[in-house]
């Protein structure tokens, strides 16, 4: 662990310097609502840039049964379709000289339209963005293109060349079986085929309403602009249907395994476990320390990264999460505005060579079990707190990201960055250990593996026999070899009725 702690300390120092350079002083927020529209205004008069965000608490959880993919397809029709005054090609032509774009993305309970523009072009950009959301064209050619794009993602991208995402989605399908989160947000093949343009119009009219809306403006905008922009959205209906009812977070006691049969040169692995914790719960913050210690996304801090990659060379990286995580573009940071009302614990193992994949799975569970049984080491606790206090500031380092996390605070009731800044200095190791024992564990797991020879993988795990590691070079230290002997026998109890093997071409069909 000496290497791990040194890396933690160095990353913390880097984060301190970066945070001081990149994060501006907190801006005074504007009105919380304008004309019945919830708002977040973050003025930074010295900035030449202005960020706009239009957030709807609408997502794939709102999809009707049999029409999975409707909510995100509707969002694509707004963000990647024409308006009543312009075709989509004309929208793109109008955006080009502004050096701006309208980005649209969504998840289970969120749809976001956002963009950043120089303040000299703000009026034109705001007009374009508002027209896209408030006066969609709903043209037949836009519908055909966007629906085909969604279908291609599900049937070609996910099934074809995105094994890591395939593994994550396969895990989520089992973890959230018969749950509004159970299908890919983009939909299923049959669901997308069943959607009509009239379905899109109806969902837009019923769900894109003010009680599910937050409008955000940040940066160097002129006086009166933010209020005027928000007022434009007062034309939307006042109320949408109630948020979809979610079943209670299940207490799962037995492990479940899904192996997706696919011609794969390396095996992608995802592990999930339901947890009844979100940002509004006190335990979320000590769990955040635990997951950062175990596997901070795409950094060398985590135990999983050190033990699996650095010491054993098993894969590119291994990470842990205690809430839904989507990487924001090319950064290493979480995408804002994808909060959910229910969350899960997840471990993501980047693809592993077939001969070592089951050892890597056992190694990840071995380290998780060790954290649950022994607690977080005092030195690791202190180093992780220091790192996380600084690194979390980087999550909101520009106007658009600050705005996104401020909108999340409106929706969830907690500003995760500010909560970490306030809680970390006072947090005790005992709080982390207690939260880990209460919410984490290596039982009740949903495990997905994308692999060739899928039935053999399933049979090997069900047999309970050891699965060792094959090193490319000699000279492995004796203490690592001794630990390998423990890991290769780490138990993963599985019963036949909880094991499924699926051919990839059947995944996400309906």
How would you describe each model-predicted region?
Residues 53-116, 182-186, 298-327:
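M16/MPP (pitrilysin/insulinase) zinc-metallopeptidase core fold and M16-derived inactive scaffolds
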Residues 86, 90-203, 248-250, 254, ...:
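Acidic/histidine-enriched segments that form metal/cofactor-coordinating
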Residues 27, 34-37, 46-53, 65-70, ...:
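Extracytoplasmic
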Residues 25-32, 172-213, 244-248, 277, ...:
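Histidine-acidic residue clusters that define the catalytic metal-binding segment
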Residues 168-169, 197-232, 444-445:
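Non-catalytic, conformational "gating/processing" segments within enzyme and secreted inhibitor domains
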Residues 149-170, 248, 252-266, 311-329, ...:
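Short acidic/His-enriched helical or mixed secondary-structure segments at domain edges of catalytic enzymes
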Residues 8-17:
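Bacterial N-terminal signal peptides
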Residues 177, 214-277, 296, 451-455, ...:
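An aromatic/glycine/proline-enriched structural segment found at the starts
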